[in-house]
């Protein structure tokens, strides 16, 4: 049966999502992707502000793939039966990769970043996984919508428990959840679900050398990403439990 759903790839930064994004774009064709490459190029090779991406959704109703560094709550703007995809990465590794990204872009220096970690401060936004999955819908339009969403990715978290609970519930609602350390399984799952001929790729490697962090510095990264660590472990545990259930059902050993 032909797959005719639209796809939303909630691309959380530094999760190896660029490789999947490019594979999906190749499979559906550039003309069926929002935000378009033209709009991305207009913004210097970066995803455009949210309100511009949503406007392009309205202008291209025949799109097949919507992807970007946008919160999962943006799904409310998409058709009800949209297929949702998310990739999670070990939160400590993801945060360190984000720091290297900041260094490569010149947003900070290595000396300043390491000093921040030594002093117990994280030089990048904390708990990105929970922010993207558990962030509350923003009721605004136009540039205000984009500005408030941008703020939501870095401002202090007001209610950690509430954010974590929403992230867990959202994670359970994702149609296809993958993990950076098992990308082949994710590609296989997407291909099975959509029939799209995906090609494994390795794109957008870090442009900054690996960092050698002390135990103290690593502890700072962990401490500031406790919500993400809990979310990551919970999602992996549920994935493994579901895999075991499917295996038992196939072997006839499953009992309700």
Question: Where do the model's predicted regions map?
Answer:
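General alpha-helical segment detector with a strong preference for membrane-spanning helices
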Residues: 18-20, 94, 232
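PAPS-dependent sulfotransferase catalytic domain
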Residues: 41-87, 92-198
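Short, conserved catalytic/metal-binding motifs centered on acidic residues
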Residues: 16, 90, 228
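PAPS-dependent sulfotransferase catalytic core
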Residues: 1-62, 98, 106
